[in-house]
Curated annotation (Swiss-Prot):
This is Diaminopimelate epimerase. Homodimer. Belongs to the diaminopimelate epimerase family. Pathway: Amino-acid biosynthesis; L-lysine biosynthesis via DAP pathway; DL-2,6-diaminopimelate from LL-2,6-diaminopimelate: step 1/1.
Length: 295
């Protein structure tokens, strides 16, 4: 059995997208890990899966998997690619879609130039909503001082459908994203692990950002990370509320807008890279894993 897939990216944040509306596949953790291997499989930052809706008021179910095989709640860049994919596959002809994720329902709107606006919902800042357990951690206003390998690190937290910690830095190019990001991602204060953003404020409508993604590592771009960083920046008075804020990442720029009390709106481009097919049984056999007899 061969399964069709599409490779896409949003600002360099790359995805493998599979239509499970018209195809059938048992996505085991082993298979996701193999598909995510850039040497032995296809390779991606996240695997996006389109499934039939589970409720009558949405168009599709949207599932997201990291390369380590874990299923995650949300992916903003992936949401934009999801919208373009279902239109290209003629699974829907709507310009505006409602899709269900593990963290709730989001709305996706595509313009005639192929840019997609995503209603990311309202940000959450309470520790219990991240989740974040700041026991014995110093808090000054909205900032937390977290002990990371004996060094205090000041950070802010937000949930944009998935958990984020954001550190304000003077220059993102000098930030120790790999070491510090990895240490904070798996810090005991974050029981479900956390995505870690490093934000530099350029002016009140422009930030530069690098993100160490949970279960992945640093990526070229992170949509939910940009939303979390801008929301925190607005909450702290560093950025203009209700205005377009440019979030500049390695892979390019997206536009984030947030008025406190309302949803965060994210707008950005998408790109198709190539299409292909793979054999689930073939991949599993090459890796020495017994295929699922029902796949």
């Amino acid at each position: 059995m061969l399964i069709e897939f599409t490779k896409m990216h949003g600002l360099g944040n790359d995805f493998m997208v599979i239509d499970l509306v018209t195809q059938r596949l048992d996505l085991t953790k082993d298979l996701v890990q193999l598909l995510g291997d850039r040497h032995l499989g296809i390779g991606f930052d996240q695997l996006l899966v389109v499934e039939p809706p589970m409720r009558p008021d949405v168009d599709f179910s949207y599932r997201i998997f990291n390369t380590d095989g874990t299923e995650v709640e949300q992916c903003g860049n992936g949401a934009r690619c999801f919208a373009r994919f279902v239109q290209a596959r003629k699974l829907s002809f709507k310009q505006r879609l409602r899709v269900e994720t593990a963290s709730g329902i989001i709305s996706l709107t595509t313009d005639r130039y192929g840019w997609v606006e995503v209603d990311m919902g309202k940000p959450k800042f309470e520790p219990s909503e991240i989740p974040f357990t700041p026991r014995a951690i110093t808090k000054i206003q909205n900032a937390y001082h977290l002990d990371v390998n004996g060094t205090p690190v000041q950070l802010y937290v937000a949930n944009m459908g998935n958990p984020h910690a954001v550190i304000k830095v003077d220059d993102v190019l000098d930030a120790d994203v790999e070491t510090l990001g990895k240490a904070i991602e798996s810090h005991p204060a974050f029981p479900e692990r956390v995505n870690v953003g490093f934000m530099q404020i350029m002016n009140q409508r422009h930030i530069r950002l690098r993100v160490f993604e949970r279960g992945v590592g640093e990526t070229q771009a992170c949509g939910t990370g940009a939303c979390a960083a801008v929301a925190i920046g607005i909450r702290e008075g560093w950025l203009d509320e209700g205005e377009d804020v440019r979030a500049q990442l390695y892979g390019g720029s997206m536009v984030i807008k947030w008025q406190p009390g309302y949803s965060v709106m994210m707008t950005g481009p998408t790109a198709f890279v190539y299409e292909g097919v793979f054999s689930p049984d073939g991949l599993m056999a090459q890796a020495g894993i017994k295929p699922n007899p029902e796949s």
